[in-house]
Amino acid sequence: MGTLHERLGENDATFLDGKLSIPRSPEGIIIFAHGSGSGRHSPRNQFVAEKLNEDGLATLLLDLLTADEEELDNQTRKLRFDIGLLSKRLISTINWVTNNRDTNNLAVGLFGASTGAAAALVAAAELSNTVCAIVSRGGRPDLAGKQVLKSVQAPTLFLVGENDPQVVELNENALKYMSTEKKKISLIPGATHLFEEPGKLEEVASLAAKWFGSYLK
């Protein structure tokens, strides 16, 4: 896929770049909300997406910031924390997916990383009848806010590196506010924030595939 056309307002439009991969007879589609300073070229998210494709799930790797915005964010580090902006664009992307003839019959799941996890939670709360499941990798669910956490109904899995204590605490606290009965936090033994240790990203991909496989029916 080349570009997605997202209309932000009556007189404003933004073009976002994304990569859409659809295996044969997919069981659902996973939209990736990338985290701080990351995008569709992230090797970690590409790895997870490929594993999900192998498991029969379509994937959409998306840049939630334009190239100009990404350049600005690399200098200011502000837009990556603008959860309102990121979630608005993610919601528009979900609507695009549900109206696209190649994907409109697929159940939707969200995979959020870092600040992208907060955007995924906001989008899931807004589109509760559309989003079927969420997986967060090293996410910042606290940035979504308590009210959003209480509003999310989709089954939600938080994956956090065992050796990432600050993010572990943030995820454990966020989980307490979630009202959905299907919620879980899994600590990946020996993993740090980026899951760069051997075999740890494979564990993330495997757990994500199982979670989505259970709820994207």
Residue ranges and their predicted role:
Residues M178-L194:
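Catalytic histidine neighborhood in serine/cysteine hydrolases
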Residues R7-T103, G199, E203:
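Serine-hydrolase catalytic machinery in alpha/beta-hydrolase-like enzymes
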Residues E196-K210:
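Post-His helix in hydrolase/transferase enzymes
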Residues D102-S114:
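Alpha/beta-hydrolase fold nucleophile elbow
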Residues S114-A117, N163:
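Active-site loop->helix "elbow" adjoining a glycine-rich segment at hydrolase catalytic centers
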Residues P165-L170:
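Conserved alpha/beta-hydrolase "acid-adjacent" motif
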Residues V152, F158-V160:
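Short beta-strand/loop motif that positions the catalytic acidic residue
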Residues N129-P141:
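A conserved short beta-strand
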